[in-house]
From Swiss-Prot:
Protein name: Protein CDV3 homolog
Organism, as annotated: Xenopus tropicalis
TM annotation in the entry: none
Basic and acidic residues biased stretches: 1-15, 61-77, 197-207
UniProt GO cellular component terms: cytoplasm
């Protein structure tokens, strides 16, 4: 029973070496595994049981490795599903109205060719392939209402040799003739006496009751001088010195 299990292990390792081709020591490990799995002559049954357990473990490892190898393939498939190429749909533009644009471009090309044929004299003559009055740039000009021209009144021309500005001319026109000045009028000849007039109010009347209005400034000094003249000292002030 041990020999077929050892052969299955050998086949497993050989297939792994063929697939990966990375491990350089693959043949050496395969030979060691062969020597390890083959039981010697006259070996007990325990050795065969251990070999069978090893073969079962090898099968489990093979299944795990095969499952791991399947996972990257699934991941690659998912990535391929995510990166989908975008295909642009073809749109039919035959229903669009592009004929007018094409016709206008053809007209412009024809005009340009005519202009080149005629040469530089074509501009001097003033020729043009299209009618300027029918262009879109003249629509606003036609819509505008005619502006009425403002007629200014001519200014009166003075024959005199003195120049007068417009402000002086207007003032001269509105000025009225005046007679001689009135000497006795307060408006034309104001006096200082008019500003010096004192208007009595109620407060001034109350102040007159409490205070004495002094009209003469030198009256107090005259009274003091009279009193001093009456108080004369007739005694001899030096008599005290003679007694000593």
């Amino acid at each position: 029973m041990a020999e077929p299990e050892g052969r299955s292990l050998d086949d497993f390792f050989a297939k792994r070496d063929k697939k990966k081709k990375k491990d350089k020591g693959g043949p050496v490990s395969a030979a060691g595994s062969r020597g390890a799995t083959r039981p010697p002559d006259g070996a007990p049954s325990s050795f065969s049981s251990s070999a069978s357990s090893m073969s079962g473990a090898g099968k489990g490892i093979k299944k795990e490795k095969s499952g791991k190898s399947e996972n990257p393939d699934q991941l690659q498939e998912k990535e391929d599903d995510e990166w989908k190429e975008f295909e642009q749909k073809e749109v039919d533009y035959s229903g669009l109205r592009i004929q007018s644009l094409q016709i206008s471009n053809e007209k412009d090309d024809d005009e340009y060719e005519k202009k080149e044929e005629q040469g530089a004299d074509w501009e001097d003559i003033g020729g043009c392939g299209t009618d300027k009055s029918s262009g879109p740039w003249n629509k606003t000009a036609q819509a505008q209402a005619p502006i009425s021209a403002v007629i200014e009144a001519p200014e009166p021309v003075h024959t005199g040799g003195v120049y007068r500005p417009p402000a002086a001319r207007a003032s001269v026109a509105t000025r009225k003739p005046q007679g001689p000045p009135e000497i006795f009028s307060d408006t034309q000849f104001p006096s200082l006496q008019a500003t010096a007039k004192h208007i009595e109010s109620r407060r001034d009347k109350e102040m007159e009751k409490t205070f004495e209005v002094v009209k003469h400034k030198n009256r107090a000094r005259d009274e003091a001088a009279k009193n001093q003249a009456l108080r004369l000292q007739l005694d001899n002030q030096y008599a005290v010195l003679g007694e000593q």
